[in-house]
């Protein structure tokens, strides 16, 4: 069995990235229970790669400490029934399911993402919580990072 232990914030930051104090404070304020925090920089964003409520999560902030997005990896059983039904009736139903995520935003509704593969093709299929198809992104041979929408 794997066990995960919480580490003090002092030891978790990637020393090669200079994370602004406003960003580290914003993380502590928004998600005080985040553990095993490792900071990454993606474009102009600072991303806290951490454990949150038992889920591997990426929490996106701008340099001023404004929260833009939380992406958490989940299991199929965590995907709402309406999304499962919509996916099972989609053109991707027979593709290999690779990963599942839910995305939280400050202003936009929550989204669920199902990442699928077939042969050398890879797609991300985005759904609303009620199972509405929102977007399909071809990430074949590309960086499959999901960036926050411009709000």
Model-derived features: where do they sit?
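C-terminal motif of bacterial Sec signal peptides marking the signal peptidase cleavage site
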Residues: 2-6
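Bacterial signal peptide processing site
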Residues: 8-11
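First exposed extracellular module after export/assembly in secreted or surface-exposed proteins
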Residues: 15-151
């Amino acid at each position: 069995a794997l066990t995960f232990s919480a580490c003090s914030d002092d030891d978790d930051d990637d020393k090669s990235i200079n994370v602004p104090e406003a960003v580290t404070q914003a993380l502590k304020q928004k998600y005080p229970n985040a553990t095993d925090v490792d900071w990454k920089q993606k474009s102009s964003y600072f991303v806290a790669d951490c454990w949150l409520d038992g889920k591997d999560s990426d929490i996106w902030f701008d340099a001023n400490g404004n929260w833009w997005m939380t992406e958490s990896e989940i299991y199929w059983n965590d995907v709402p029934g309406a999304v499962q039904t919509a996916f099972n009736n989609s053109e991707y139903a027979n593709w290999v399911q690779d990963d599942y995520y839910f995305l939280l935003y400050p202003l936009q509704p929550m989204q669920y993402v199902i990442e699928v593969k077939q042969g050398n093709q890879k797609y991300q299929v985005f759904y609303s919580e009620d199972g509405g198809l929102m977007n399909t992104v071809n990430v074949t041979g590309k960086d499959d990072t999901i960036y926050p929408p411009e709000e």
